[in-house]
UniProtKB/Swiss-Prot annotation:
Highest taxon listed in the record's lineage: Eukaryota
Keywords, alphabetical: Mitochondrion
Species, as recorded: Marchantia polymorpha (Common liverwort)
Major location (coarse): mitochondrion
Stated name of the protein: Uncharacterized mitochondrial protein ymf3
Pfam families: CcmF_C
Location in the cell: Mitochondrion
Gene Ontology terms: cellular component: mitochondrion
Gene Ontology BP term (one): cytochrome complex assembly
Gene name of this polypeptide: YMF3
Length: 169
């Protein structure tokens, strides 16, 4: 599960970087407007993808966050969405009921409202990110209806990170 979250985080990071940061950086470096259309696609996007893909392969080969134990030792603060299921499973039954109610009722209703409200805007602005967002929405709704509470929390982790990333643009 940790590797899956890392993969989606880097996928979103690559898409956002290529769509927003690359034209700005090229404008600063070249001092002119750089088009991101079809004629310039290979010259603008591919070098960034290649370099970041090499970084991703290097991080994976170093064994970055392969298990929850390593995540707890290495990056405890950054791994809060990953550690949430462990916190829930060690809680008292009364606290589990409260957290379950909050995750299923409050967080999912807020997330589904924002997804429906901003969907047309995101389709126009970030079509690739919208596709990934629809996938995360399916995972969250599927996990909370049929899975356990820890599955719900695991599904909400990358979904919340993705939604915050979308709103920050």
């Amino acid at each position: 599960m940790v590797q899956l979250q890392n993969f989606f985080f880097f996928l979103i990071f690559l898409v956002v970087l290529c769509g927003t940061a690359a034209p700005i950086l090229f404008q600063w470096l070249v001092s002119r407007d750089v088009s991101t259309g079809a004629p310039f696609f290979n010259g603008t996007i591919i070098p960034i993808f290649t370099s970041l893909l090499l970084v991703l392969v290097y991080i994976h080969s170093r064994g970055f966050m392969r298990s929850l134990d390593e995540a707890k030792r290495i990056v405890l603060i950054r791994a809060r969405p990953i550690l949430l299921p462990n916190i829930i499973e060690k809680s008292s039954p009364k606290k589990i009921q409260y957290i379950s109610f909050f995750l299923d009722e409050k967080a999912l209703s807020i997330f589904s409202f924002f997804r429906q409200f901003f969907f047309s805007f995101f389709v126009r602005q970030f079509p690739a990110l919208c596709f990934v967002g629809q996938y995360f929405g399916f995972v969250v709704s599927h996990k909370t209806k049929s899975g356990t509470l820890s599955d719900s929390a695991r599904a909400l982790g990358p979904c919340c990170c993705f939604f915050i990333l979308l709103l920050s643009n």
